[in-house]
Curated annotation (Swiss-Prot):
It comes from Xenopus laevis. GO terms for cellular component: membrane. Its EC number is 1.11.1.9. Keywords: Membrane, Oxidoreductase, Peroxidase, Transmembrane, Transmembrane helix. The active site is at 79. This is Probable glutathione peroxidase 8-A.
Protein backbone atom coordinates (compact mmCIF):
# COMPACT_ATOMS: atom_id res chain seq x y z
CA UNK A 1 0.00 0.00 0.00
CA UNK A 2 1.34 3.40 -0.94
CA UNK A 3 1.26 6.38 1.39
CA UNK A 4 -1.94 8.37 1.24
CA UNK A 5 -0.03 11.53 0.47
CA UNK A 6 3.40 10.84 -1.04
CA UNK A 7 3.92 14.42 -2.15
CA UNK A 8 4.67 17.51 -0.11
CA UNK A 9 1.67 19.60 0.84
CA UNK A 10 1.39 22.72 -1.28
CA UNK A 11 -0.12 25.77 0.33
CA UNK A 12 -2.27 28.06 -1.74
CA UNK A 13 -0.77 31.13 -0.06
CA UNK A 14 1.92 32.16 2.45
CA UNK A 15 -0.85 33.03 4.92
CA UNK A 16 -2.12 29.45 4.86
CA UNK A 17 1.36 28.13 5.61
CA UNK A 18 1.77 30.57 8.52
CA UNK A 19 -1.62 29.52 9.91
CA UNK A 20 -0.68 25.83 9.87
CA UNK A 21 2.64 26.54 11.59
CA UNK A 22 0.91 28.70 14.21
CA UNK A 23 -1.72 26.05 14.93
CA UNK A 24 0.99 23.40 15.24
CA UNK A 25 2.84 25.54 17.77
CA UNK A 26 -0.33 26.06 19.79
CA UNK A 27 -0.99 22.32 19.81
CA UNK A 28 2.54 21.53 21.00
CA UNK A 29 2.32 24.20 23.70
CA UNK A 30 -0.99 22.77 24.90
CA UNK A 31 0.43 19.25 25.10
CA UNK A 32 3.44 20.47 27.08
CA UNK A 33 1.19 22.35 29.52
CA UNK A 34 -0.94 19.25 30.11
CA UNK A 35 2.14 17.10 30.69
CA UNK A 36 3.64 19.66 33.07
CA UNK A 37 0.40 19.95 35.03
CA UNK A 38 0.23 16.18 35.39
CA UNK A 39 3.83 16.08 36.58
CA UNK A 40 3.22 18.78 39.17
CA UNK A 41 0.14 17.02 40.49
CA UNK A 42 2.00 13.72 40.72
CA UNK A 43 5.12 15.18 42.38
CA UNK A 44 3.92 18.18 44.34
CA UNK A 45 0.18 18.10 44.74
CA UNK A 46 0.35 18.33 48.53
CA UNK A 47 2.82 18.54 51.39
CA UNK A 48 2.62 14.83 52.15
CA UNK A 49 3.75 13.89 48.64
CA UNK A 50 7.34 14.96 49.39
CA UNK A 51 10.33 13.20 50.91
CA UNK A 52 12.65 14.79 53.46
CA UNK A 53 15.67 13.68 55.47
CA UNK A 54 15.67 12.91 59.18
CA UNK A 55 18.35 13.93 61.67
CA UNK A 56 20.29 10.72 60.94
CA UNK A 57 20.36 11.31 57.19
CA UNK A 58 17.65 8.79 56.30
CA UNK A 59 14.95 9.51 53.73
CA UNK A 60 11.49 9.98 55.22
CA UNK A 61 8.30 9.99 53.14
CA UNK A 62 5.98 12.63 54.55
CA UNK A 63 3.10 10.42 53.40
CA UNK A 64 3.45 8.67 56.78
CA UNK A 65 1.75 11.74 58.30
CA UNK A 66 -1.14 11.80 55.85
CA UNK A 67 -4.45 11.73 57.71
CA UNK A 68 -3.07 13.86 60.55
CA UNK A 69 -2.88 17.59 61.14
CA UNK A 70 0.73 18.80 61.11
CA UNK A 71 2.28 22.01 62.38
CA UNK A 72 5.44 22.55 60.32
CA UNK A 73 8.03 24.83 61.92
CA UNK A 74 11.50 26.13 61.03
CA UNK A 75 13.37 25.97 64.35
CA UNK A 76 16.63 27.47 65.60
CA UNK A 77 18.24 26.71 68.97
CA UNK A 78 20.06 30.04 69.31
CA UNK A 79 17.07 32.22 68.49
CA UNK A 80 15.64 34.51 71.22
CA UNK A 81 12.25 32.94 70.46
CA UNK A 82 13.56 29.39 71.00
CA UNK A 83 12.53 28.69 74.59
CA UNK A 84 8.98 30.05 74.39
CA UNK A 85 8.33 28.40 71.04
CA UNK A 86 9.86 25.01 71.82
CA UNK A 87 7.88 24.77 75.05
CA UNK A 88 4.57 25.78 73.45
CA UNK A 89 5.15 23.44 70.50
CA UNK A 90 5.83 20.53 72.85
CA UNK A 91 2.68 21.37 74.80
CA UNK A 92 0.59 21.33 71.60
CA UNK A 93 2.19 18.04 70.57
CA UNK A 94 1.49 16.51 73.97
CA UNK A 95 -2.09 17.79 74.09
CA UNK A 96 -3.28 16.83 70.60
CA UNK A 97 -0.85 14.16 69.41
CA UNK A 98 0.27 11.73 68.41
CA UNK A 99 -2.72 9.96 66.82
CA UNK A 100 -4.27 12.99 65.11
CA UNK A 101 -1.64 15.74 65.28
CA UNK A 102 2.11 16.21 65.17
CA UNK A 103 4.67 18.99 65.13
CA UNK A 104 7.29 18.63 62.38
CA UNK A 105 10.45 20.63 63.13
CA UNK A 106 13.00 21.61 60.49
CA UNK A 107 16.18 23.28 61.81
CA UNK A 108 17.38 26.18 59.65
CA UNK A 109 20.42 28.46 59.93
CA UNK A 110 19.32 31.13 57.44
CA UNK A 111 17.97 33.64 59.96
CA UNK A 112 20.67 35.28 62.07
CA UNK A 113 22.81 32.12 61.78
CA UNK A 114 21.08 30.97 64.95
CA UNK A 115 21.23 27.23 64.21
CA UNK A 116 24.93 26.49 63.54
CA UNK A 117 25.09 23.06 65.22
CA UNK A 118 24.96 19.59 63.72
CA UNK A 119 21.72 17.63 63.47
CA UNK A 120 22.74 15.54 66.47
CA UNK A 121 23.59 18.61 68.58
CA UNK A 122 20.32 20.32 67.65
CA UNK A 123 18.19 17.30 68.54
CA UNK A 124 20.02 16.65 71.81
CA UNK A 125 19.68 20.27 72.92
CA UNK A 126 15.95 20.39 72.13
CA UNK A 127 15.33 17.19 74.05
CA UNK A 128 17.52 18.12 77.02
CA UNK A 129 16.39 21.74 77.45
CA UNK A 130 12.75 21.58 76.37
CA UNK A 131 11.74 17.92 76.58
CA UNK A 132 10.96 17.80 72.86
CA UNK A 133 9.42 14.52 71.65
CA UNK A 134 8.10 15.59 68.23
CA UNK A 135 10.03 14.73 65.02
CA UNK A 136 13.17 16.76 64.31
CA UNK A 137 14.45 16.56 60.74
CA UNK A 138 17.77 17.35 59.10
CA UNK A 139 18.83 20.99 58.88
CA UNK A 140 17.56 22.57 55.68
CA UNK A 141 17.38 25.80 53.72
CA UNK A 142 13.95 27.30 53.26
CA UNK A 143 14.86 30.38 51.23
CA UNK A 144 16.47 30.76 47.81
CA UNK A 145 17.20 28.35 45.01
CA UNK A 146 18.35 25.61 47.43
CA UNK A 147 15.15 25.65 49.47
CA UNK A 148 13.79 22.27 50.52
CA UNK A 149 11.03 21.33 48.01
CA UNK A 150 8.56 20.45 50.77
CA UNK A 151 9.06 23.89 52.30
CA UNK A 152 8.82 25.56 48.92
CA UNK A 153 5.37 23.98 48.64
CA UNK A 154 4.32 25.63 51.91
CA UNK A 155 5.57 29.02 50.76
CA UNK A 156 3.99 28.71 47.31
CA UNK A 157 0.68 27.63 48.85
CA UNK A 158 0.43 30.64 51.17
CA UNK A 159 2.47 33.20 49.22
CA UNK A 160 4.09 33.88 52.59
CA UNK A 161 7.81 33.32 52.95
CA UNK A 162 9.22 32.93 56.49
CA UNK A 163 10.94 36.10 57.65
CA UNK A 164 12.46 34.61 60.80
CA UNK A 165 12.75 31.44 62.87
CA UNK A 166 9.68 29.60 64.19
CA UNK A 167 7.32 30.47 61.35
CA UNK A 168 4.48 27.95 61.56
CA UNK A 169 2.29 26.35 58.88
CA UNK A 170 -0.74 24.23 59.78
CA UNK A 171 -1.26 21.42 57.27
CA UNK A 172 -4.52 19.47 57.07
CA UNK A 173 -4.85 15.66 56.69
CA UNK A 174 -4.84 16.00 52.89
CA UNK A 175 -1.55 17.90 52.87
CA UNK A 176 -2.91 21.39 52.18
CA UNK A 177 -1.93 24.47 54.19
CA UNK A 178 -4.86 25.96 56.10
CA UNK A 179 -3.15 28.68 58.15
CA UNK A 180 0.22 30.13 59.17
CA UNK A 181 1.60 32.04 62.16
CA UNK A 182 4.57 34.32 62.79
CA UNK A 183 7.08 33.52 65.57
CA UNK A 184 5.69 36.15 67.95
CA UNK A 185 2.18 34.67 67.92
CA UNK A 186 1.45 32.66 71.04
CA UNK A 187 0.37 29.05 71.44
CA UNK A 188 -2.99 30.36 72.64
CA UNK A 189 -3.65 31.78 69.18
CA UNK A 190 -2.70 28.47 67.54
CA UNK A 191 -4.52 26.07 69.87
CA UNK A 192 -8.11 26.80 68.68
CA UNK A 193 -7.19 26.16 65.04
CA UNK A 194 -5.40 22.92 65.88
CA UNK A 195 -8.24 21.78 68.14
CA UNK A 196 -10.82 22.46 65.44
CA UNK A 197 -8.87 20.50 62.83
CA UNK A 198 -8.30 17.58 65.22
CA UNK A 199 -12.03 17.47 66.02
CA UNK A 200 -12.81 17.25 62.31
CA UNK A 201 -10.37 14.36 61.93
CA UNK A 202 -11.89 12.47 64.88
CA UNK A 203 -15.45 13.01 63.64
CA UNK A 204 -14.55 11.82 60.16
CA UNK A 205 -12.94 8.67 61.53
CA UNK A 206 -16.04 7.93 63.62
CA UNK A 207 -18.26 8.34 60.56
CA UNK A 208 -16.09 5.88 58.64
CA UNK A 209 -16.46 3.16 61.30
Amino acid sequence: MEPLNPYPVKFSSPKAKVSVVFLSMLLCTGILCVLQLGFLRAKGGDFYSYEVTDAKGRAVALSKYRGKASLVVNVASGCPHAEANYRSLQELHREFGPSHFTVLAFPCNQFGESEPGTNQEIGALAKRNYGVTFPMFSKIKILGSEAEPAYRFLVDSTKKEPRWNFWKYLVDPQGQVVKYWRPDETAESIRPEVASLVRQIIMKKKEEL
